[in-house]
């Protein structure tokens, strides 16, 4: 009976979206003819380059997705030098493409990050590896990160980090001009929180990011994280030959990654030495100790260079994802006090009567409004506004045949702000995830991706965000800076606030 119901639900799901899929694919007749790349509409190369370099398009790539869909439809083509990119901005077409993926989906193969690894003879981690190496790393890490119970295992560690964040927010209030409860540049504080949290999980040790005096090497790492995304965007936009004439972006990218690798190496070696001392010089055997690095270090098939590459890249991923999403969440909650009040009530109701303990990871994952707030923030401000694929075979996308080895960009920002999927798409409305209004296409908002290339740290990031929001709203009422203008997002490889977000944290 259970299997029958599961099968029926899958069939219902496919039938339900069949009309939209057919419309998006342009199937007017059963024998609709497929068309080639030459038939795909798009901007001329001069106008595309002018948009990127003369009109600030590099920092507005997310907005260009929306403009492209409005001007050319759900599929368009743009050329930059010898590189042709197909842009896909309809949920049904995104689904069609992703469901044609093979066992080892490839992303943009000319990443400057991969080039840095090659130049410095560094091993690639999960973010930069491709092919068999990527598949091996993902198979190794998936049981440690993707399963819900695996993330919940770190709840105690993360709870301690969140408590330190609350204390730091208290200390940071009233510095400089403005109201006494104002904390300036909350994203900067949450960068420290993100690094402390992911390091506690990866290394099983604390870095002191949330102390009154932040260690200098930690500040250097955080600056490198912010800088590397800017230099990545500039480097990818430049032809390779131009680096000799304008060496700045590539030089900064290498410097930033060198600093991050040096930071990770110091802490990996320290962690390895501590583990050896605890075990009398023998490898650490406790694979349930809660530190992912224990799993990395003492599996013979993972070389030391691969351990370092993975730790460095996971530290980077953990910092930016959590810090930006938490900044946007509190920004929107401060501007929508009715949602903040309802969420505070939901969180306090989950506390045990007479208990000062915070809700457990299991309880937090069952709070509907809390989950809806996180989903709505990620819909409005996806950390990665667009994803890329390089198919290893010819694929069909709507009316078109996309040849293998063609770069395809999935426009997640455009689909998540599509008014056909989300009424009032630019409004913060968590209730849309609680049954209010039409149900969007399941591929309309994919902040963590889909399939084999989906975000490995999704469970951990969701838990960290839920715990941080729960504790912050338990202690503080969050209000906007008086007289502050709205903050818009900008592209810096990832989506970030265009300027500092300043918020008031008033004691409850």
UniProtKB/Swiss-Prot annotation:
Catalytic activity annotation: calcidiol + 2 reduced [adrenodoxin] + O2 + 2 H(+) = calcitriol + 2 oxidized [adrenodoxin] + H2O; secalciferol + 2 reduced [adrenodoxin] + O2 + 2 H(+) = calcitetrol + 2 oxidized [adrenodoxin] + H2O; 25-hydroxy-24-oxocalciol + 2 reduced [adrenodoxin] + O2 + 2 H(+) = (1S)-1,25-dihydroxy-24-oxocalciol + 2 oxidized [adrenodoxin] + H2O; 25-hydroxyvitamin D2 + 2 reduced [adrenodoxin] + O2 + 2 H(+) = 1alpha,25-dihydroxyvitamin D2 + 2 oxidized [adrenodoxin] + H2O
Localization terms from the record: Mitochondrion membrane
Effect of residue 107 to H: In VDDR1A; complete loss of activity
Biological processes, Gene Ontology terms: bone mineralization; calcitriol biosynthetic process from calciol; calcium ion homeostasis; calcium ion transport; decidualization; G1 to G0 transition; negative regulation of cell growth; negative regulation of cell population proliferation
Cofactor dependency: heme
Main location: mitochondrion
GO molecular function: calcidiol 1-monooxygenase activity; heme binding; iron ion binding; secalciferol 1-monooxygenase activity
UniProt cross-references to SUPFAM superfamilies, sorted A to Z: Cytochrome P450
Pfam family, one: p450
Keyword entries, A-Z: Disease variant, Heme, Iron, Lipid metabolism, Membrane, Metal-binding, Mitochondrion, Monooxygenase, Oxidoreductase, Transit peptide
Consequence recorded when altering residue 389 to C: In VDDR1A; complete loss of activity
Domain of life, per lineage: Eukaryota
Tissue: Kidney.
Gene Ontology CC terms: cytoplasm; mitochondrial outer membrane; mitochondrion
Effect of substituting residue 321 to R: In VDDR1A; complete loss of activity
InterPro entries: CYP11_CYP27_families, Cyt_P450, Cyt_P450_CS, Cyt_P450_E_grp-I, Cyt_P450_sf
Binding site for heme: 455
Reported regulation of activity: Activated by cardiolipin and dioleoyl phosphatidylethanolamine (DOPE), phospholipids found in the inner mitochondrial membrane. Inhibited by high substrate concentration.
Family label: Belongs to the cytochrome P450 family.
Disease note: Rickets vitamin D-dependent 1A: A disorder caused by a selective deficiency of the active form of vitamin D (1,25-dihydroxyvitamin D3) and resulting in defective bone mineralization and clinical features of rickets.
Role summary: A cytochrome P450 monooxygenase involved in vitamin D metabolism and in calcium and phosphorus homeostasis. Catalyzes the rate-limiting step in the activation of vitamin D in the kidney, namely the hydroxylation of 25-hydroxyvitamin D3/calcidiol at the C1alpha-position to form the hormonally active form of vitamin D3, 1alpha,25-dihydroxyvitamin D3/calcitriol that acts via the vitamin D receptor (VDR). Has 1alpha-hydroxylase activity on vitamin D intermediates of the CYP24A1-mediated inactivation pathway.
Official protein name in the record: 25-hydroxyvitamin D-1 alpha hydroxylase, mitochondrial
Organism this protein belongs to: Homo sapiens (Human)
Lineage: Eukaryota, Metazoa, Chordata, Craniata, Vertebrata
Gene name for this UniProt entry: CYP27B1
């Amino acid at each position: 009976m259970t299997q029958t119901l599961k099968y029926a639900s899958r069939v219902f799901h496919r039938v339900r979206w069949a009309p939209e899929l057919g419309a998006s694919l342009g199937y007017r007749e059963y024998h609709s003819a497929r068309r080639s790349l030459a038939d795909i509409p798009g901007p001329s190369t001069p106008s595309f380059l002018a948009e990127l370099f003369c009109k600030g398009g590099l920092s507005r790539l997310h907005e260009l997705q929306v403009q492209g869909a409005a001007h050319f439809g759900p599929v368009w083509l743009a050329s930059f030098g010898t590189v042709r990119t197909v842009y896909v901005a309809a949920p049904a077409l995104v689904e069609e493409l992703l469901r044609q993926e093979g066992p080892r989906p490839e992303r943009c193969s000319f990443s400057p990050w991969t080039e840095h690894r090659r130049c410095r003879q560094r091993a690639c981690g999960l973010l930069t590896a491709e092919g068999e190496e990527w598949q091996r790393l993902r198979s190794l890490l998936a049981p440690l990160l993707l399963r819900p119970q695996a993330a919940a295992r770190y709840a105690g560690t993360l709870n301690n980090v969140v408590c330190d964040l609350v204390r730091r927010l208290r200390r940071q209030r009233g510095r400089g001009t403005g109201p006494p409860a104002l904390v300036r540049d909350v994203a900067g504080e949450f960068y420290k929180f993100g690094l402390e949290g992911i390091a506690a999980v990866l290394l099983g040790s604390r870095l002191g990011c949330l102390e009154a005096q932040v260690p200098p090497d930690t500040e250097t790492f955080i600056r490198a994280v912010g800088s590397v995304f800017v230099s990545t965007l500039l480097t990818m936009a430049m032809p390779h030959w131009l680096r000799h004439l304008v060496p700045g972006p590539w030089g900064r990218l290498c410097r930033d990654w060198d600093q991050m690798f040096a930071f990770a190496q110091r802490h990996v070696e320290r962690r390895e030495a501590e583990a050896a001392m605890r075990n009398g010089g023998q490898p650490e055997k406790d694979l349930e100790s809660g530190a992912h690095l224990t799993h990395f270090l003492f599996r013979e098939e993972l070389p030391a260079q691969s351990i370092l590459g993975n730790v460095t890249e996971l530290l980077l991923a953990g910092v930016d994802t959590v810090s930006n999403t938490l900044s946007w969440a509190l920004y929107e909650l401060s501007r929508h006090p009715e949602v903040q009040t309802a969420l505070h009530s939901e969180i306090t109701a989950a506390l045990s009567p007479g208990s000062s303990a915070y809700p457990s990871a299991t309880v937090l994952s069952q709070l509907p409004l809390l989950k809806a707030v996180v989903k709505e923030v990620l819909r409005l401000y996806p950390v990665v506004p667009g994803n890329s694929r390089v198919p290893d075979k010819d694929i069909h996308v709507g009316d078109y045949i996309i040849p293998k080895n063609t770069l395809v960009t999935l426009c997640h920002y455009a689909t998540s702000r599509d008014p056909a999927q989300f009424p009032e798409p630019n409004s913060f409305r968590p209730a849309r995830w609680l049954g209010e209004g039409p149900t969007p296409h399941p591929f309309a908002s994919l902040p963590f991706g889909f399939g084999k290339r989906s975000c490995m740290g999704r469970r951990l990031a969701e838990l960290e965000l839920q715990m941080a929001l729960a504790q912050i709203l338990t202690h503080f009422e969050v209000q906007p800076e008086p007289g502050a203008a709205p903050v818009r997002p900008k592209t810096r490889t990832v989506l970030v606030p265009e300027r500092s977000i300043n918020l008031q944290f008033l004691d409850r």
